[in-house]
Amino acid sequence: MKKITLFLAACFMLAPASQAETQPAVTFNWAHTVDGATSAGDNIIGMVKASGGDCYVATTWGTNSGASQVNLWFDGEQVTGADGAAIVGSPYTGTSKNGNMFLQKVSNAGSIVWNAYTRKGDIAHDKSHIVSTKDGGLLAVLKTRAWVAEAGYDNLVEYVDPTGHVTTIKDMGNVSGEYRYLVLKIAENGSLEWSRLIAGKVEKRKKGFTKDNMSVYGVAVDEDGGIYLTGNFRTEMYLKKTDGTVETLTAKNTTEWDGDSQGVVGDLFLAKLDKDGYFVKSLTAEGIAASAFLDKVVYADGNLYFNGRIKGKTGNELTLGGKAVSVTNDCENLLLASVSAADLSVGYVKTITPVGSKKTIHNNGCQWIDGYVYFTGSSMGGLTGLYENSKGQHKGYILKMDPATGEVVKSAIRLDGGIGKFYGVYLNGSTMYAFGYDMTGGALLVPVDAATLSLGTAITLCKYGVVAAGCTPIIDGENMVVANRGRNTATLYGTDYSYTGNKNWAMIYYSYKLAGTSVGIGTTTAESQKGKTDVYTLDGRLVKSAQSYDKAVGGLAQGVYVIGNKKVTIR
């Protein structure tokens, strides 16, 4: 192993000084499409790495029974259930659609291990999430509502597992059309183990009832199975404890919300649940903000790192966990923070003020890689002291944060092309890429100089028109799995593969092998360890199991792992 490590080091020395100036050499592996028949129902919830080299992919497809648009197609073939009949989503009749989840376990070679889906309840894809768990399964945190009389106003979700077994999750206190959250624990075979309900308070306001009163924007899991939710709420939140009682979180800024679901108001929150989904502890801000959100979160080394957005309110001072929050009142400021996972005590809170005529920022990715936190998203303006954007459009950004101090040590924004966004980065040694989209080009892979974050010339991985949607990619050794939405025709880079003839828009997820990626081993003395070896990320996610140490570390991306109960750095 030492000889291999030295050889790889020599190879890196011979590599070009700036990877960002080199056209990325990528090789197509495989691709899949998920396609419903409605015009706006196909979207991505997320994808995560699972055990044994597999991954979980959660998408949504729309149904409208009035237009006979209730079925689903995968790779152009109609999807059937365990009984051999075509699967059918929730009934719905109207001008929009009902969102149904399609959950798949996929091997790293692209073969489908199993399918599961929902057929009651309207899933909000953009505020729902999946995250893998230590036991090889996953959590699905779903924002859902019962709004269809034919499906039953008390049926939040009906989950159909890979064997065809149906579980209906009811909420007798639900108000028709009210969004609530369900935390679902799903086993590695796709069966549903348990569900927990998180509800809010519905009140009559100027523009209607407060039925969209909370949103979860980020989810993380620690090595003990503890669950962390970040987001925004606007009335009250009710979370169940192990003793059967309910914890109530009360928002401070409630009077300014008129009930409009698109209103930019409310309070930020961080909620800790135990491994069984019961409430443990929470963190909210002290003082009143005009609006406050916690967005993406990642767990590492006993701490939570997250970003957010916060806008001040005249005459009000803000603190988070006793730490002062410096914030302006004219726009949402970018918030970066560190919190202890054990007791939710705050290590630091940093804010960065946007600059320019347009200052909106979207936070879409948060990754722990090689001892740093990488944030990605889009920004309409610049960020004070980091980068400028005078284009007046959303442009993809990357921030590299030192987790010890909260300081942004490097930053980048891509000003080329049209409206754009980054969802995440790939880093292995000196090889780095950013994945996102450009609405004038498609889904992009942009080479990045790992030392400076300078951006190279992008290639278009997927040409699909002007529809923009995606999620943080899966990093699987030297392979990367990405997803985006497209119209009914798309082509992929470096292959003759394409899809045509889909009903309307479709989701496509696909895998590429990235060139120039190699793995070296450092800071471990367990090289010759024999027997079954499990590999975990520092947030407790099982990456894979192997029959020897050498097989366990083979193919791992750069980063810090727990291998055989020891912390190991892959360089």
Where are these regions (language model features)?
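Cross-kingdom Sec-pathway N-terminal secretion signals
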Residues: 5-6, 20
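Bacterial N-terminal signal peptides
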Residues: 7-15
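C-terminal outer-membrane/trafficking sorting elements
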Residues: 520-571
